[in-house]
């Protein structure tokens, strides 16, 4: 099963940067799942792409995107800056809400590792915008204030 060809590459403008993403859009989509991946991972993760492909086959759209630019990812501390990751996820979620193709879809988060912490924090900030959160091997403890 080739899970890498089922998406379109997009660029999401966030403040002064652009985040790269892979959007899979299901026909008659039931919702869209935003992936908030963990430290050291990316939108190209074979594991997350498999999950996104599975979701597509079951009627869910998905967006795998990099929370950090390539330059930012070279700074190790950024991978654990939960506030930065949360801010990015909130802004991408708002972008999804403003996009004509996705604004009508219920939104869920799929977080792994440190991405689970940013998913929980972002969902708390966005009130009732997020309808579901999945944490796979997550670090929810990092979502709590220090």
Region annotations inferred by a language model:
Residues 2-3, 27, 100, 126:
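Solvent-exposed alpha-helices and their adjacent loops that cap or buttress functional pockets
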Residues 2-10:
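Short, hydrophobic/aromatic-rich segments at coil-to-beta transitions
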Residues 89-146:
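Primarily recognizes the serine-hydrolase "nucleophile elbow" in alpha/beta-hydrolase
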Residues 10-105:
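Serine-hydrolase catalytic machinery in alpha/beta-hydrolase-like enzymes
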């Amino acid at each position: 099963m080739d899970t890498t060809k089922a998406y379109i590459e997009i660029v999401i403008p966030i403040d002064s940067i652009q985040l790269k993403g892979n959007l899979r859009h299901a026909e008659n989509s039931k919702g869209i799942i935003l992936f908030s991946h963990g430290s050291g991972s990316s939108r190209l993760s074979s594991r997350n792409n498999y999950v996104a492909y599975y979701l597509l086959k079951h009627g869910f759209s998905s967006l795998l995107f990099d929370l950090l630019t390539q330059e930012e990812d070279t700074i190790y501390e950024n991978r654990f800056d939960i506030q930065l990751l949360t801010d990015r996820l909130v802004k991408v979620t708002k972008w999804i809400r403003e996009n004509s193709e996705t604004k009508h879809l219920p939104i869920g988060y799929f977080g792994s590792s440190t991405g689970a912490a940013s998913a929980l924090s972002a969902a708390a900030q966005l009130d009732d915008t997020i309808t579901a959160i999945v944490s796979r091997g997550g670090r929810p403890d990092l979502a709590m204030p220090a």
